[in-house]
Amino acid sequence: MAELSRRRFTLAGLGAAGLGIAATDLVVGGGVAAAAPVPDAGADQSWPFLTQGFGPVSVAPGDRRYPDLLLRGYNRRFTGNPDAVKLVGSTSQVVQAVNEAVAAGKRVTVRGGGHCLENFVDDPDVRVVIDLSEMRAVYFDATMNAFAVEGGAILSQVYRTLDLGWGVTIPGGSCPSVGVGGHITGGGYGVLSRLYGLVADNLYAVEVVVVDAFGMARSVIATSSANDPNRDLWWAHAGGGGGNFGIVTRFWLRSPGATGTDPTKLLPPTPGGIMITTLFWDWSQLDEAAFTTLVTNFGTWHEQNSAPGAAANQLWASLIAIRQGKGGVIVRAQVDPTVTGTQQMLTDFAAAMTRNVAAAPAASTTGNLPWLYTTTTSASEVAGVFGIPSLLLRSKTKGAYHKKGYTPDQLRTVYRYLTSPSYTYASGLMGLFSFGGKVNSFSPTTTAVPHRDSVMLASFSNYWSDAADETRQLQWVRELYRDVYATTGGVPVPNGVTDGNYVNWPDVDLADPAWNTSSAPWSTIYYKDNYARLQQIKAARDPRDIFHHALSVRPH
């Protein structure tokens, strides 16, 4: 029982951390504070008492700080060797660093939180990395009537400052160390998205450093206002993905439809607490039929309870199935128990999950947990769950949007991959996460995020530490994904059942004809019909293709 309890605890943490697959630093908070003025777009707009005196700092090979900055990357499969890492403290310093790199003919990219799953930053061709980690201020900007978040902030900082200062939050991810830069520009999905949409749906403006046709960098402020001549740049950064158009040094957040100037009313309210129900099955309890029934139950519930405005959007759930030998199957659901009816919702959800599943799970329900503490400190990092030191963590993640659940044939395939004794490494998994609700109330063209009728997000991941295992570890997750989506060319093409993949789960295999044999290119899988507009914006805003990576938007 001690081992079962330990496993249930670590797997429950992974249920939350899976969204990041993705320590609170000094931030600025307080009540309705005096806002930082917003000067001309080209001026330095950073908070002086956080950034004055810092930067720019250039760290090159041979500097003792250089290895630390390279290790900010999440995935040890990739390690860059740039000529310099430029630590910056202001927008003007970013402009300067970009200008220097472009003038020298050096490929430049940006790092925020460091959680990119592919080698978009840690690419051997990248010669200059602009590191935004010292630009992390969070404050209310009365001039913009919105909350400003600098591009180097991480989610835990944002949640803490918004909650302690104004009692509001954003519907972002549950891995606290994820950076806002990639997260928001890729859409920004999290536990509260069924209630409040994606973070990109709550994005009012961005400040972006772009490079013109003459190779000159400058900063531009782009808002969602219909009469803003730079609105296209806002739209592209509301889900178009990071590393495509420029470097975002600041985001301004305000919920659509919010009115007035009271900052406590301009973003979603912080939940009153969190109550979590956890159901755990060991693999010894689940044969193929029971596993198929359980996962089908999860999909059916989401098909029936994910429409915009549905009461059940108060509940968010995950199902994590980890390979035999390391864990089992855990279903985790959470609500705000201070909302009337939600505790009964948890009970009803648990009954729906266990229907016709012969084996009874180990079940537990927490009391009312503090929202901020639980959100920022209790989500387990993947490395800790699997016992892999973070310095050695190597991974591969593949994803899919689902409008409907899986077929029995697909689930038999998943079961075989998760339980077959022919594969002995135990840290592979499938994860399913609640989607829909408020997200699906927006048009596919409101922002650059086109996926507006799915009810679940699925992920298939593998984690390991030894570089010598690379080939077989990649083969396992690649073949699992290919076989699950075998009837559609090995990928989740947009159709009546699946709807492509989440931009923040980049997968270069989608651009490889060896693994994507469908007629849908990677750009359709990620962007659907919005890709053509993104290409137009790319051509206009980054005509020299300064900002690019393996899956970046291509100019016309």
Task: List each model region and its residues.
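Glycine-/small-residue-rich beta-strand-loop submotif within the FAD-binding core of flavoenzymes
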Residues: 76, 92, 122-150, 191, ...
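Cofactor-binding catalytic cores of oxidoreductases
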Residues: 39, 43-74, 113, 118-121, ...
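FAD-binding subdomain of flavoenzyme oxidoreductases
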Residues: 172, 177-281
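Glycine-rich N-terminal segment of FAD-binding domains in flavoprotein oxidoreductases
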Residues: 63, 74-135
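Structural signature of FAD isoalloxazine-binding scaffolds in flavoprotein oxidoreductases
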Residues: 87, 118-136, 194-212, 247-250, ...
